[in-house]
Amino acid sequence: MKAAEIREKFLKFFESKGHTIVRSSSLVPGNDPTLMFTNSGMVQFKDVFLGTDPRPYSRATTAQRSVRAGGKHNDLENVGYTARHHAFFEMLGNFSFGDYFKHDAIKFAWELLTTVYQLPKDKLWVTVYQEDDEAYDIWAKEVGVPTERIIRIGDNKGARYASDNFWTMGDTGPCGPCTEIFYDHGPDVWGGPPGSPEEDGDRYIEIWNLVFMQFNRDAQGNMTRLPKQSVDTGMGLERLAAVLQHVHSNYEIDLFQNLIKAAARVTEISDLTNNSLKVIADHIRACSFLIVDGVIPGNEGRGYVLRRIVRRAIRHGYKLGRKGAFFHKLVADLVAEMGTAYPELKEAEQRVTDVLRQEEERFFETIEHGMSILEAALAEVEAKGGKVLDGELAFKLHDTYGFPLDLTADVCRERGMTVDEPAFDDAMARQREQARAAGKFKATQGLEYSGAKTTFHGYEEIAFDDAKVVALYVDGSAVNEVKAGQDAVVVLDHTPFYAESGGQVGDQGVLANAATRFAVADTLKVQADVIGHHGTLEQGTLKVGDVLRAEIDAQRRARTQRNHSATHLMHKALREVLGAHVQQKGSLVDADKTRFDFAHNAPMTDDEIRRVEQIVNNEILANAPGIVRVMPYDEAVKGGAMALFGEKYGDEVRVLDLGFSRELCGGTHVHRTGDIGLFKIVVEGGVAAGIRRVEAITGDNAVRYVQELDARVNEAAAALKAQPSELTQRIAQVQEQVKSLEKELGALKSKLASSQGDELAQQAVEVAGVYVLAATLDGADAKTLRETVDKLKDKLKSAAIVLAAVEGGKVSLIAGVTPDASKKVKAGELVNFVAQQVGGKGGGRPDMAQAGGTEPANLPGALAGVKGWVEERL
């Protein structure tokens, strides 16, 4: 039974038992930055189990894409070395939310395994928590499993309820016993049953875990029964497939064998048992699905984990002899295997391929040099009888050549060595400290504040009359008084000043009363709900307890709001034009522009830019109102509000409806889309692999930009004696004229060079049977120099020639050597002899080479030395 059929039978079985088939959630958990990746089927149902996310069903079943690489759950270092560890795997699960409990969960599992999958009953063993008599009795008395194959597992992890068979969501909250089902591969395989000293062997393999959420644990450790008891089960598809296909390694199942064969094809390796092929086959699944879910290779967080996995796969390909990009070629094979079950993979095939290719090409630029350094260092350690690689060197490989630590550790492991990780960590810490010392960090960092939070009025007001000073800071320390001329941070109890957040810059403005004036240059958060006003006291003395009028720079705020609102419209438009894979990766919104970074792996075309501009400007013309609502996070997301992956939102969120856009946002915005005025994209470019950046302007800035552009068009039209509407046609005509003139000029140069070549041939000097010529060819370009050298070689038959030309203070050099002389005189060496004397360098083939220089004054002397240089070699 193939993996695809196993997956399908699982889902259909539970659908027949009243379960709703729920699509796999993203590998990037929504609204939970504490979890690096989705690593089990229950992640998407966490809030359902907690009772905060009601669903229209009480039974669900899923085939959940999962990743265990990075963060608390990390199997990456074991991938390729064991039979059952994967960076990516599929978790089959069925769930009950206050519906059925132990009886049905156990009976469903037994029926599926023994009736649908037809596993022999005598091959199945089960474990239960030692105190879970109910589950024990169901297995023994109702299902009929012999008691010798039912094993009670106690608290085997050093504390009460700390057991392999007792599950907890955390220190407090839902928890309960679980029962696990094992498959016995038979006495020919080493290992003992669960709970025995030999349980880590491969004979008894866990295939399914049924968790019974039965209790709620409070902070004191007290257990009370939940009013609604639930079930969460998980069974690894790969493990189940190995059992059903009668193999002992997950890498021997059909799905992996097809990917391993594909990896062998692109790496040109015939040994299908090679561990590197297993790594590559596993990693193409993890990398592809992470990219499908919006993760892009980067230097931090999830992006860095993806980069580590890609580079680990590349290193294994390099180990197999690949010196160029190969990994991305496996995406099509993965789509063939899993595209039907996961249509989102097929839809994103080209994007995934492009992102992986770009990341590969980037790493292949440095891997060879880095590997040579690493191999040399390991050889040196081995020669000294050592077993540990210097952590400083590992850090150099990380910092200079892009080698993640686990990649270096992987190579060491293959040689029976380890990395000095504490020394690596020390080197990393030193670099971070140096970066911190060199950088200019905001003064709010490290400020100690324990007072009340600031009440923000900036959504409705631009000024607040009775703002009380509750804290003052100078040079990072709390003070009671600030004097004129001092820079300080002021914390108020109430303020209209927006603190930098969500990409929007902080407000500027003034804090003042009759005797005092404090100019606010920036506004930043001291803590989550505490706002710091950074600036300079221009007049008077400011004390804690003083009352001030706080007034923002209204014009600057208005321009910033226009840009922020335009960013929302642009984000939506980009998704419409480029696709739903577009996700915000960063932004900066200030009074001058909006800068927006997003996931997309190709430059935008002119047409795509125009379409985005048109969509946004149509929304502006519609003059739709901006509607702000505060609601529960889950309600907002269900209502279509766009939330940014990786951001942590509170239970209550602020939702902005602006035209066709709906996003979670705490920033300030225009009242109507028409307030934006005009939207214009002025810059589009790449900032990293798979990340594009757009800069745009709005309002009066956009009007000025268009007017200035119009003026330049008129100037260009006048210079070409054309109307602005005829400019494109006129430029094309001029380009044709230039092309024609360049062709004529080239012909004249060739003719001149030919005639000069005849004259130059007469200047050649014979040295040991070889004609040597070094001369300047006035007015020649590189092409003409090359053609002339070829003609002279034909004419002189046996020759070593250097020709030079000077234009605009730069020297061009071409050297040519006939085949009979090139064994002793190399054109590359000859041209470099001259180039080094004129401030340049070059290279090429033994028979033809070129170079350049920047010191034409030295050229005559350099050419004069050619004859002697050739004589020495002949």
Curated annotation (Swiss-Prot):
Its main location: cytoplasm. It holds the Pfam family tRNA-synt_2c. GO terms for biological process: alanyl-tRNA aminoacylation; negative regulation of DNA-templated transcription. One of its GO terms (cellular component) is cytosol. It catalyses: tRNA(Ala) + L-alanine + ATP = L-alanyl-tRNA(Ala) + AMP + diphosphate. Binds 1 zinc ion per subunit. Keywords: Aminoacyl-tRNA synthetase, ATP-binding, Cytoplasm, Ligase, Metal-binding, Nucleotide-binding, Protein biosynthesis, RNA-binding, tRNA-binding, Zinc. Its EC number is 6.1.1.7. The keyword RNA-binding applies. GO terms for molecular function: alanine-tRNA ligase activity; aminoacyl-tRNA deacylase activity; ATP binding; tRNA binding; zinc ion binding. It is an enzyme of class 6 (ligase). Zn(2+) binds at H564, H568, C665, H669. Its cofactor is Zn(2+). It is found in: Cytoplasm. Catalyzes the attachment of alanine to tRNA(Ala) in a two-step reaction: alanine is first activated by ATP to form Ala-AMP and then transferred to the acceptor end of tRNA(Ala). Also edits incorrectly charged Ser-tRNA(Ala) and Gly-tRNA(Ala) via its editing domain. Belongs to the class-II aminoacyl-tRNA synthetase family. Consists of three domains; the N-terminal catalytic domain, the editing domain and the C-terminal C-Ala domain. The editing domain removes incorrectly charged amino acids, while the C-Ala domain, along with tRNA(Ala), serves as a bridge to cooperatively bring together the editing and aminoacylation centers thus stimulating deacylation of misacylated tRNAs. This is Alanine--tRNA ligase. It comes from Burkholderia orbicola (strain AU 1054).
